[in-house]
Amino acid sequence: MEFSVKSGSPEKQRSACVVVGVFEPRRLSPVAEQLDKISDGYISSLLRRGDLEGKPGQMLLLHQVPGVLSERVLLVGCGKERELDERQYKQIINKTITTLNETGSMEAVCFLTELHVKGRDTYWKVRQAVETTKAGLYSFDQFKTNKAEPRRPLRKLVFNVPTRRELTIGEKAIAHGLAVAKGVRVCRDVANMPPNVCNPAYLASQARRLADAFDNITTKVIGEQEMAELGMNSYLAVARGSDNEAMMAIIEYKGHPDAKPIVLVGKGLTFDSGGISIKPAEGMDEMKYDMGGAASVLGTMHALAQLQLPINVIGVLAGCENMPGGNAYRPGDILTSMSGQTIEVLNTDAEGRLVLCDALTYVDRFDPETVIDVATLTGACIIALGHHTTGLLANHNPLAHELLNASEQAGDRAWRLPLFDEYQEQLESPFADMANIGGRPAGTITAAAFLSRFTKKYNWAHLDIAGTAWKSGKEKGSTGRPVPLLTQFLLNRSGVVIEEKE
């Protein structure tokens, strides 16, 4: 798919299709009014007949509109003009792309980016249109023998901006949107892979492929032997029941000669059976998504490589598989972590934190500016926040605020939960320094409280994506989140000016 921006009048576009908005009740947008005027009232007469009300998602495809050079005009219902918000805008774009793909129009000029969206500017509208378009066209069908493809798919999309002085910001929005979309696609592809393909070695191979493609990226992979030498006994315990070797890939992006790195750590449980504390059979297939954190870090590193930002970033993919077996770790085991702290295992299905605690200890050697871990960590986060919002906890208020700001800018929402000292009491163990679970109350918070014991030397934030990393049901599959949030955070950290409020 090719994207571009231009500034021009709708009636002068020589295109397979021009896309304009119609508001409820049967009110033409300013651009649609221009087409109506040049067509001598042709469009408004259709609306008066009741062909289109303008409700959100309604579509009306017109052919050979009088006075218009374009072959087709697609009227898109946008709802009530004053109520057009971010969510509705993205839904409208998504429905528009689906419709265009079915019309046989291989290219189109879209004027929906001129609509007024509350609190959002041209940059945001163009970038979100790019990201939404790419997400809407995504499919994971490489294991299907019969692939359904449109007869004449949409190949080129031009977004119109109101003035020529906005062309530069529109081009920047496309570049940023394509980078985020690339990262999201990588994340979705890797996460959707079946666990008999995507094991820790596969994750590591994807990290190496990225390094092979860019001169300023290097990748190192640590296997179980080196982990043992480093004392990563907590990480290794989780891997003991599986025949697939645990591997931790460290991807280093160098965009600045001497800046301290931002470190992203992704939980990479390529399959989580629960171990000895085994999960129910129903829905266990979705535990291939327990590496969603690592997939999102890999995707973010791809987006970063596309953007070539002037910062240093290290992405860690903590790959592992949690399986039952004769050598698997057990409830009651006491583990000595890389930090030297001891952990009593009360539940082997609380394994993500046991992998992450050693990974978080390991990254201290990089003298990081900031560390952010990303993990499908707790079912409790789904109970608290559902499937729309990522859980955020942090030991540093400015970092938490940065991430919340990035989440709002990117449309990839997060919500901060508290991390008060009182929650630490739930992790007390009579036999070790701590237990690996803290009981049913505040499960997301106690999981983060556990991790916070290994992050005292640097500014740290934790993103719990258990509810947002994938969808179940008829839309089953990875969402690619929180790649947009993380990429926006890196854009902001690099000093790129990308959005101005209207």
Curated annotation (Swiss-Prot):
Enzymatic class: hydrolase
Binding residues annotated for Mn(2+) 2, in chain numbering: 267, 272, 290, 351
Main location class: cytoplasm
The reaction(s) this protein catalyses: Release of an N-terminal amino acid, Xaa-|-Yaa-, in which Xaa is preferably Leu, but may be other amino acids including Pro although not Arg or Lys, and Yaa may be Pro. Amino acid amides and methyl esters are also readily hydrolyzed, but rates on arylamides are exceedingly low; Release of an N-terminal amino acid, preferentially leucine, but not glutamic or aspartic acids
Subcellular location: Cytoplasm
One Pfam family hit: Peptidase_M17_N
Record flagged with keyword Transcription: no
Free-text remark on how the cofactor is bound: Binds 2 manganese ions per subunit.
Cofactor annotation: Mn(2+)
Region forming the signal peptide: none
Chain segments annotated as transmembrane: none
Biological-process GO terms, alphabetical: proteolysis
NCBIfam families: PRK00913.1-1, PRK00913.1-2, PRK00913.1-4, PRK00913.2-4
Role: Presumably involved in the processing and regular turnover of intracellular proteins. Catalyzes the removal of unsubstituted N-terminal amino acids from various peptides.
HAMAP family reported for this sequence: Cytosol_peptidase_M17 (MF_00181)
Protein name in UniProt: Probable cytosol aminopeptidase
